[in-house]
Amino acid sequence: DGFECGGHPGEDDIPNFILLPRAADELTIPFVASGGMADGRSLVAALAMGAEGMNMGTRFIVTEEAPVHENVKQAILAASELDTRLVMRPLRNTERVLINPGVERLLEKEAALGSDIKFEDIAPEVAGVYPKIMKNGDMDAGAWSCGMVAGLIYDKPTVQELVDRIMSEADSLISERLKNFL
């Protein structure tokens, strides 16, 4: 995953504009781009950088069929690319999450404890919170993964509508906008 991703981006902070071409240079097997992917522009860019396709996490959460609480979908729709935070860095288990009161508590603990922090110190904000958030809609229960791509999510289509739109956008980009570069 590129640094933009929701969830665990690794510890080296490498965005997809660097990571994907490096992967294309180094790998001898097909790979998909992941992190910051939302639309036809993402797909065309991923293909141009050597990926065979793209993986979308945060974007697919905001679809009609996604089996998560409506509060999660609405929180992502209301968010911008500036509303995520990186947590658990001192533990070298960095996770990108959507800001909420539980995340603010976690960040306060990280700031106060610094390098002395232990998982047990933040367990209330991370351990077992996913069912509370994703199933019950308790948006302040703690940290939950969300990518910076939230800033590019404006609607809640069906999966079919989303995939069709992505393919149509990619086709238009390639056949109209990019044709003049050849």
Regions found by a protein language model. Name each.
Residues 1-2:
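Non-cysteine beta-strand/loop elements that form the S-adenosyl-L-methionine
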